[in-house]
């Protein structure tokens, strides 16, 4: 059973890294390696698609508690303690840790998230999909302050909110880089290729997060996550485009003050803060250099060309399992785009199609099975939409719902 304590016998925090071979996981291991007096790795988990990286991590960290979800990959690796679809969850349940970093990709992170919360460990959450999909279940399972966000935007909000009391908050402002297609027209987006969508202008991320950032679905997920993490109504959460990605989010208070968190785009800063919260890790990232001339731009998000955020707001305000439906529909549509089956705008068009038909899921889930049922339905509905998707039809569906 994972147990949250003040750390190991030597005072270091014991960290379990889920999704260790991905972008967040590899950077987290670099942060841990650079601060051996603060952190130690006690377990690693990965899907198994990047086996060479996982084996190298095992050798570098010396850990023996390892989970691989893909059984074939686990057999190739040899001497893997936890194998199969439930391997990651069992690793969380049976490994003593103070911090569980969930950097898994997709809604498969839900059960490990719930297991980490049940253990009492601090959850450093990078797997936004588990919170978006699990919503009420995750919040019910969490103790106050147990979840610390890893996303740069939510890490920024957590820092800014320390400047006032909850009743003094007027609104939260999420910033978005705008992605690689900022300023493009809807017609331009019809010709986007997977290669173009995989090139983010300011951040280095995994392929799924990069695609979600290009479609602005990522910002939609972050909008939902913001509401769930901080309890602020959707109408008091704004999204603005900030191409430089220096200001990561802002909080406006009732007296008119706006507090912003600014730093060069580097995920090691929010990762280090989530691992060591509330203590900061010296040297985690570069400072802003104000001795050099800079221009920071802010502009409104074009909801007509990029309707993913407003669709997420619709799903969140509707409630129930609708955010799980939003996420599952996106996962199916994104995979179809990467496979060349649909156009780039049809990703969000597919989400809109699925949400149009999802009234039955506007009921709060009683358990994980309810969430999984909603996601299963959404994936099936998304596949039907994908099969008949056309760019024109997709745009019409989005316009009808947003």
UniProtKB/Swiss-Prot annotation:
Pfam name, any one: DXPR_C
Enzyme class: oxidoreductase
Amino acids binding NADPH: 21-24, 47, 50, 127, 129, 206
InterPro entries linked: DXP_reductoisomerase, DXP_reductoisomerase_C, DXP_reductoisomerase_N, DXPR_C, DXPR_C_sf, NAD(P)-bd_dom_sf
Keyword Membrane assigned: no
Documented EC number(s): 1.1.1.267
Entry keywords, A to Z: Isoprene biosynthesis, Manganese, Metal-binding, NADP, Oxidoreductase
NCBIfam families: Dxr
Pathway this chain belongs to: Isoprenoid biosynthesis; isopentenyl diphosphate biosynthesis via DXP pathway; isopentenyl diphosphate from 1-deoxy-D-xylulose 5-phosphate: step 1/6
Protein name: 1-deoxy-D-xylulose 5-phosphate reductoisomerase
Cofactor(s) it depends on: Mg(2+); Mn(2+)
Amino acids binding Mn(2+): 151, 153, 222
Species this chain originates from: Mycobacterium marinum (strain ATCC BAA-535 / M)
GO terms of biological process kind: isopentenyl diphosphate biosynthetic process, methylerythritol 4-phosphate pathway involved in terpenoid biosynthetic process
PANTHER family named among the record's database cross-references: 1-DEOXY-D-XYLULOSE 5-PHOSPHATE REDUCTOISOMERASE, 1-DEOXY-D-XYLULOSE 5-PHOSPHATE REDUCTOISOMERASE, CHLOROPLASTIC
Residues engaged in binding 1-deoxy-D-xylulose 5-phosphate: 128, 152-153, 177, 200, 213, 218-219, 222
Domain of life: Bacteria
Gene3D superfamilies (alphabetical): 1.10.1740.10, NAD(P)-binding Rossmann-like Domain (3.40.50.720)
Catalytic activity: 2-C-methyl-D-erythritol 4-phosphate + NADP(+) = 1-deoxy-D-xylulose 5-phosphate + NADPH + H(+)
Family matches, as HAMAP family: DXP_reductoisom
């Amino acid at each position: 059973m994972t147990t949250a304590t003040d750390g190991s016998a030597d005072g270091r925090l014991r960290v379990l890294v889920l999704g260790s071979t991905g972008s967040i996981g590899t950077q987290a291991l670099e942060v841990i390696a650079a601060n051996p007096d603060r952190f130690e790795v006690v377990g690693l988990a990965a899907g198994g698609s990047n086996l060479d990286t996982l084996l190298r991590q095992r050798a570098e960290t010396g850990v023996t508690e390892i989970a691989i979800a893909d059984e074939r990959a686990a057999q190739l690796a040899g001497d893997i303690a936890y194998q199969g679809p439930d391997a990651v969850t069992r690793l969380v349940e049976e490994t003593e840790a103070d911090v569980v970093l969930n950097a898994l990709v997709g809604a498969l992170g839900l059960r490990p998230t719930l297991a980490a919360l049940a253990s009492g460990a601090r959850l450093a959450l990078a797997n936004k999909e588990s919170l978006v999909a699990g919503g009420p279940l995750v919040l019910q399972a969490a103790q106050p302050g147990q979840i610390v966000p890893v996303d740069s935007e939510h890490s920024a909000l957590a820092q800014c909110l320390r400047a006032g009391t909850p009743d003094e908050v007027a609104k939260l402002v999420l910033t978005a880089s705008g992605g690689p297609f900022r300023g493009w027209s809807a017609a331009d987006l019809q010709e986007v290729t997977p290669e173009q969508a995989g090139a983010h202008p300011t951040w280095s991320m995994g392929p799924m997060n990069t695609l979600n950032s290009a479609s602005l679905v990522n910002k939609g997920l972050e909008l939902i996550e913001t509401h769930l993490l901080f309890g602020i109504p959707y109408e008091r959460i704004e999204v603005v485009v900030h191409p430089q990605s220096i200001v990561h989010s802002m909080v406006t208070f009732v007296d008119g003050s706006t507090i912003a968190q600014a730093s060069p785009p580097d995920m090691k800063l929010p990762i280090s803060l989530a691992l060591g919260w509330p203590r900061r890790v010296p040297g985690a990232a570069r400072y802003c250099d104000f001795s050099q001339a800079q221009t920071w731009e802010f502009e409104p998000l074009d909801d007509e060309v990029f309707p993913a955020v407003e669709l997420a707001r619709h799903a969140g305000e509707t409630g129930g399992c609708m955010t799980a439906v939003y996420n599952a529909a996106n996962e199916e549509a994104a995979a179809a785009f990467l496979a060349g089956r649909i156009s780039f705008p049809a990703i969000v068009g597919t989400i809109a199609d699925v949400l149009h038909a999802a009234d039955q899921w506007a009921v709060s889930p009683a358990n994980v099975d309810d969430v999984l049922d909603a996601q299963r339905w959404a994936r099936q509905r998304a596949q039907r939409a994908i099969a008949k998707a056309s760019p024109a039809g997709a745009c019409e569906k989005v316009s009808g719902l947003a």
